[in-house]
């Protein structure tokens, strides 16, 4: 996979990526380096990552051996909060971290989100590198400069735009994932295909097995996102296309967070995409044919999640806190047809309830 070099960030891959990261660390001569992980990536990925970068040359190995610190967050979205951020900030202060320091966020979307937020706010900003270890992190969460934490059960309600200096994608980490983690990331790949083009959509929706997800498909998904954020890094216009499925998806994810029915991010967004496809049929002119195509594609890959009337009402109430809202309106990104979108669309509560009815059929 070819490196993707942009003005604000670089996305590097596998062995060549490690070479470039090692060179970057040597040139920057960081005073301290923090490896930020969660319990899973500490167990399954940290040793492999350190070995890969330390094997580049003895100088890098010496820097990492002498200047590095390690902090592991509890696993799961519930750790992406202000309390855990404070603990890491305190750890950085106690260990003498200054502006000439680096944080390497090794993990899935939770780690890269909170790690980027911690880095971008500590001493008004220190450098950070994202090393995503999940499919969702590789194609979506680690790319694009969105950092943040959850607060009062609201997704990513506190955060800022700040780009990682480097995003290093090592696809061998995908071997550490279970099917649930893969399918969660695949949801974002479906989203990228839907907003990109009919050809991309047809390629993705015809995948019969998770084992058929190829490196080329992952790379094309990354390129789709990069091509959008390059034109609109702070989400003033076309970057809002990437919010398809995320208005209702985030509300569902927030509502179920911390319960026995808690969903991974991609699982919640998958539901959101079906719901918002129904809204698109009613509001922005998506054809019945393409609506049914979208629903069927998700039905084949994702389990149906049941919601009763009370739960749907509670999810609706969460929508008023969505950070994409403006002037009292709940804003949706809706499809006109595969590859064509409209932003800042509205739908009333009655239509949203109808969308849940459609999803549950």
Regions inferred by a protein language model and the residue ranges of each:
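A glycine/threonine-rich phosphate-anchoring loop and its flanking beta-alpha core
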Residues: 12, 117-207
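Short glycine/serine/threonine-rich phosphate/pyrophosphate-binding segments
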Residues: 110-117, 250-251
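Active-site segments that bind and position negatively charged phosphate/pyrophosphate groups
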Residues: 202-313
């Amino acid at each position: 996979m070819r490196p993707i070099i942009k003005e604000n960030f670089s996305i590097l891959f596998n062995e060549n990526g490690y070479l470039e990261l090692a060179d970057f660390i040597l040139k920057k001569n960081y005073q301290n380096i923090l490896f930020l992980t969660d319990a899973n990536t500490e167990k399954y990925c940290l040793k492999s990552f350190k070995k890969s970068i330390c094997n580049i040359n003895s100088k890098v190995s010496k820097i990492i051996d002498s200047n590095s610190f390690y902090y592991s967050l509890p696993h799961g979205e519930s750790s992406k909060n202000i309390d855990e951020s404070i603990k890491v900030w305190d750890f950085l202060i106690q260990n003498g971290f200054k502006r000439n320091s680096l944080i390497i966020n090794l993990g899935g979307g939770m780690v890269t989100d909170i790690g980027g937020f911690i880095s971008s706010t500590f001493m008004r900003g220190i450098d950070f590198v994202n090393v995503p270890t999940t499919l969702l992190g590789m194609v979506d969460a680690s790319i694009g400069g969105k950092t943040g934490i959850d607060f009062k059960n609201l997704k990513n309600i506190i955060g800022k735009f700040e780009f990682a200096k480097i995003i290093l994608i090592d696809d061998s980490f995908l071997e550490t994932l279970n099917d649930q983690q893969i399918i969660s990331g695949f949801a974002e790949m479906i989203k990228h295909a839907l907003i990109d083009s009919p050809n991309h959509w047809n390629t993705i929706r015809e995948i019969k097995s998770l084992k058929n997800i190829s490196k080329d498909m992952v790379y094309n998904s990354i390129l789709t996102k990069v091509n959008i954020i390059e034109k609109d890094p702070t989400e003033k216009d076309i970057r809002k296309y990437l919010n398809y499925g995320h208005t209702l998806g985030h509300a569902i994810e927030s509502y179920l967070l911390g319960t026995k029915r808690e969903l991974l991010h991609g699982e919640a967004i998958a539901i959101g995409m079906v719901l918002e496809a129904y809204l698109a049929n009613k509001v922005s002119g998506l054809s019945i044919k393409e609506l049914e195509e979208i629903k069927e594609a998700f039905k084949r890959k994702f389990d149906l999640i049941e919601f009763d009337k009370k739960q749907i009402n509670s999810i609706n109430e969460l929508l008023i806190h969505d950070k994409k809202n403006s002037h009292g309106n709940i804003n949706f990104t809706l499809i006109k047809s595969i590859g064509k979108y409209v932003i800042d669309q509205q739908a009333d509560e009655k239509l949203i309830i109808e969308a849940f009815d459609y999803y549950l059929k």
